[in-house]
């Protein structure tokens, strides 16, 4: 691929730029709401969190694709994975629709369906790095959002910072969930190259049940409590109170007040 073609392949799509703009609009509305819980506050935080989460999904998948591209899988550019266009993902419902549903129901940042990358020719270490690239993006976003909240929080604009804290919380839920060594998740994909071939073959069929595990994690009280306990612990390391994220969750999921 020519240098010009490479630049075209990594150029952000208009849809991704639109999602960034929508996130900014939601943030502006939340800023204007100040510290008052009013319809503008609900609308602003809802738009900011949903659009912001879609942006993070794009960046997560871009992390996988760009790392694979750097290690020699140039087909990811042909498939459009480097454009940050959500339409290029393997399955729109699993990549976008299901994560939105999980946020609506339980405030969990569910990872989307993974992009298809070719790693068979890579070294074991590089295959692991490709798998960890997506969760690394979630970690970086969480740190950025929490640092901004810690340093810039202003009670007069508490609505905005509650939304930012909740968006950071979602990044941490995605990080913890993704790093679990469960077939079908990034954590297992990072370990898989280090397993014996017969072990890989034996566990391969379990990958199709990754969604079932996510549902069990969501519905089983013990597993759910353990999962959120880890997330809250990581969140509190930032020095930002998780109560702020809880307030953001209520604003973003405003229907939970009545249902």
UniProtKB/Swiss-Prot annotation:
Signal peptide: none annotated. Its cofactor is Zn(2+). InterPro entries: Metallopeptidase_M50B (IPR052348), S2P-M50-like (IPR044537). Its main location: membrane. Keywords: Cell membrane, Hydrolase, Membrane, Metal-binding, Metalloprotease, Protease, Transmembrane, Transmembrane helix, Zinc. Zn(2+) binds at residues 60, 64. The chain crosses the membrane at residues 14-34, 39-59, 97-117, 128-148, 156-176, 215-235. One of its GO terms (molecular function) is metal ion binding. GO terms for biological process: proteolysis. One of its GO terms (cellular component) is plasma membrane. Disruption phenotype: Not essential. No effect on processing of anti-sigma factors RsdA, RskA, RslA or RsmA. It is found in: Cell membrane. The active site is at residue 61. It is a multi-pass membrane protein. Binds 1 zinc ion per subunit. PANTHER family: ZINC METALLOPROTEASE MJ0611-RELATED, ZINC METALLOPROTEASE YWHC-RELATED. Belongs to the peptidase M50B family. This is Putative zinc metalloprotease Rip2.
């Amino acid at each position: 691929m020519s240098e010009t073609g490479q630049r075209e392949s990594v150029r952000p799509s208009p849809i991704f730029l639109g999602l960034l703009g929508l996130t900014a609009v939601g943030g502006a509305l939340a800023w204007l709401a100040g510290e008052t819980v009013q319809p503008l506050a609900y609308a602003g935080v809802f738009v900011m969190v949903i659009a912001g989460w879609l942006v993070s999904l794009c960046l997560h998948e871009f992390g996988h694709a760009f790392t694979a591209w750097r290690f020699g899988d140039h087909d990811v550019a042909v498939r459009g994975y480097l454009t940050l266009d959500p339409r290029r993902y393997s399955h729109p419902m699993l990549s976008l629709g299901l994560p939105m549903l999980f946020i609506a129901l339980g405030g969990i940042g569910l990872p989307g369906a993974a992009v298809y990358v070719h790693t068979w020719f890579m070294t074991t270490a590089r295959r692991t790095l490709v798998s960890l690239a997506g969760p690394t993006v979630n970690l970086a976003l969480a740190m950025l959002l929490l640092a901004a909240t810690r340093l810039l929080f202003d009670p007069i604009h508490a609505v905005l910072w509650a939304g930012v804290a909740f968006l950071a919380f979602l990044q941490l839920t995605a990080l913890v969930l993704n790093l679990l060594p469960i077939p079908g998740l990034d954590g297992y994909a990072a370990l898989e190259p280090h397993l014996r071939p017969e072990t890989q073959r034996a566990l391969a069929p379990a990958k199709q049940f990754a969604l079932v595990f996510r549902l069990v994690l969501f519905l089983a009280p013990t597993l759910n409590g353990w999962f959120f306990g880890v997330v809250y612990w990581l969140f509190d390391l930032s020095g930002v109170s998780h109560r702020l994220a809880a307030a953001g969750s209520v604003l973003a999921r405003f229907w939970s007040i009545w249902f």
